[in-house]
From Swiss-Prot:
Name of the protein this chain belongs to: Bifunctional protein GlmU
Residues that, per the record, bind Mg(2+): 108, 230
Cellular component annotations (GO), alphabetically ordered: cytoplasm; membrane
CDD domains noted in UniProt: GT2_GlmU_N_bac (cd02540), LbH_GlmU_C (cd03353)
Chain positions covered by the region annotation Pyrophosphorylase: 1-232
Catalysed transformations (reactions): alpha-D-glucosamine 1-phosphate + acetyl-CoA = N-acetyl-alpha-D-glucosamine 1-phosphate + CoA + H(+); N-acetyl-alpha-D-glucosamine 1-phosphate + UTP + H(+) = UDP-N-acetyl-alpha-D-glucosamine + diphosphate
Places the protein is found: Cytoplasm
Catalytic residues identified in the record: 366
Binding of acetyl-CoA, residues: 383, 389-390, 408, 426, 443
Annotated coiled-coil segments of the chain: none
Purpose: Catalyzes the last two sequential reactions in the de novo biosynthetic pathway for UDP-N-acetylglucosamine (UDP-GlcNAc). The C-terminal domain catalyzes the transfer of acetyl group from acetyl coenzyme A to glucosamine-1-phosphate (GlcN-1-P) to produce N-acetylglucosamine-1-phosphate (GlcNAc-1-P), which is converted into UDP-GlcNAc by the transfer of uridine 5-monophosphate (from uridine 5-triphosphate), a reaction catalyzed by the N-terminal domain.
Listed EC numbers: 2.7.7.23, 2.3.1.157
């Protein structure tokens, strides 16, 4: 029978060096809170319960997680006094099952991988396992001291290390997998008899060794998995490290970046082969790119699906839209939520489309607003066409059937329908339905005054 798994996330720190009114764990990395990264990762495992220890800004932290992770059963425990990591875990004991095991994680160490946590859990065969790392410069970090047989016997802090111990390059990450029975046994015994007068979680290691427990240690695949965030410089550095990892994975899948250091992925991005991404492009949420997609500079693409062989020109914003194959977009186009562009359609410069469907091969080339509309196949929408969809209270639909032609600078006042192969003359204001194959115009008749003289200054 598999042992039950609890996750304890320590998220009580203020993050004074961030100089922010927002709790440190709510600072964002790749478009997601630091705490959100930890929750998403650990819940790729089979987790029975999650306990989050909160402190400074606890209401903000709870509100954020309740909104973003309402589907997760989370137990909240307050650490009213910041008395060290050992104390932070100790306050969870009233909520922690007596059996099973717990992963102890940190809300400001966001990039530990699911694979690493699974390996750490599997390594816990005698009551405790821990995540360590061998580094070139261990100064200031707790060293892992081993006996002559290679077993862990203690964690030595920098200030307590002798000259030999200071040469040790294996350091403690602070991430553990521990049997709950041992946590219930050891944590009440922690002492704050030290210079900082804090309760150190690392003290449970020497307690376990004294009980004859063999502590397993594993190392993560990447150094950044154990990097914490204490200030904005560290946050920015970790952001670039993570972006580099995301970009490298996409390059291996066949995506070409004009400059891998000048793109941001703030969510998940999957892409087909022979995709090109120019500089300054930002992806947010869940984005999917087909094969041979070409994205030029400065575009923002959020929660969108882009079909094969699409060309997105500079400075387009695409938000929660679905784009078919062979579509041309932009430059400076704005696709708002619930927009669908069918295959081989075209949306040109300074066009805004909201909650509308553009049919196969249809074109909205210049300076138009299309909202709450259904446009058929082979339709041409001229420059400056506006669908007037809002009367101040209600939104109404505009329907344009196949092969219609809408002349430039026309206003279509919804609700209205333009029939199949109908033509709307340029400059018209259309307030009534237009029959199929008809020509409709609604504008003042042109008059002309010959020999007209302009006013002159007196």
């Amino acid at each position: 029978m598999t042992s039950s798994l609890s996750v304890i996330i320590l998220a009580a720190g203020k993050g004074t060096r961030m100089q922010s009114a927002k709790p440190k764990v709510l600072q964002t990395l790749a478009g997601k809170s630091l705490l959100g990264h930890v929750l998403d990762t650990c819940h790729q495992l089979t987790v029975d319960d999650t306990i989050i220890v909160h402190g400074f800004g606890g209401e903000q932290v709870q509100d954020h997680i309740d909104q973003q992770y309402a589907h997760l059963p989370i137990t909240w425990v307050a650490q009213t006094e910041q008395l060290g990591t050992g104390h932070a875990v100790k306050v969870t004991l009233s909520e922690l099952p007596k059996d099973g095991q717990s992963l102890i994680l940190y809300g400001d160490v966001p990039l530990v991988s699911c694979q690493t946590l699974a390996t750490l859990q599997d390594a816990n065969t005698d009551g405790m396992s821990m995540l360590t790392l061998t580094v070139d410069n261990p100064f200031g970090l707790g060293r892992i001291k081993r006996d002559k047989d290679g077993n862990i016997e203690a964690i030595i802090e920098q200030k307590d290390a002798n000259s030999d111990e200071q040469q040790i390059q294996e350091i403690n990450s602070g991430i553990y997998c521990v049997d709950n029975a041992l946590l219930h046994k050891f944590l009440p015994k922690l002492s704050n008899d030290n210079a900082q007068q804090e309760y150190y979680l690392t003290d449970i290691v020497k307690m376990a060794v004294a009980d004859g427990i063999t502590i397993a240690a594993i190392e993560p695949e990447h150094t950044f998995e154990i990097e914490g965030v204490n200030n904005r410089q560290q946050l920015a550095s970790l952001e670039r490290t993570w972006q580099g990892k995301l970009v490298a994975d996409l390059q291996e899948a066949g995506v070409q970046f004009a400059d891998p250091t000048r793109v941001d992925i703030r969510g998940t991005l999957s892409a087909g082969q022979d995709v090109f991404v120019d500089v300054g492009v930002v992806f947010e949420g869940d984005c999917v790119l087909g094969d041979n997609v070409y994205i030029e500079a400065g575009c923002v693409i959020k929660n969108a699906q882009i079909g094969n062989a699409c060309h997105i020109k500079p400075y387009c914003v695409i938000d929660s839209a679905e784009v078919g194959a062979g579509v041309d977009i932009g430059p400076f186009a704005h696709l708002r939520p619930e927009t669908i562009l069918s295959d081989n359609s075209k949306v040109g410069n300074f066009v805004e489309i909201k909650k509308s469907t553009i049919g196969d091969g249809s074109k909205v080339n210049h300076l138009s607003y299309i909202g709450d509309a259904t446009i058929g196949t082979g339709v041409n929408v001229g420059a400056g066409v506006i669908t007037c969809n809002y009367d101040g209270v209600n939104k109404s639909q505009t329907i344009i059937d196949d092969n219609a032609f809408i002349g430039s600078n026309s206003s279509l006042v919804a609700p209205v329908k333009i029939g199949d192969t109908a033509t709307v003359a340029a400059g018209s204001v259309i307030t009534k339905n237009v029959d199929a194959h008809a020509l409709a115009f609604g504008r003042a008749r042109q008059t002309q005054k010959n020999d007209f003289k302009r006013p002159t200054k007196k």
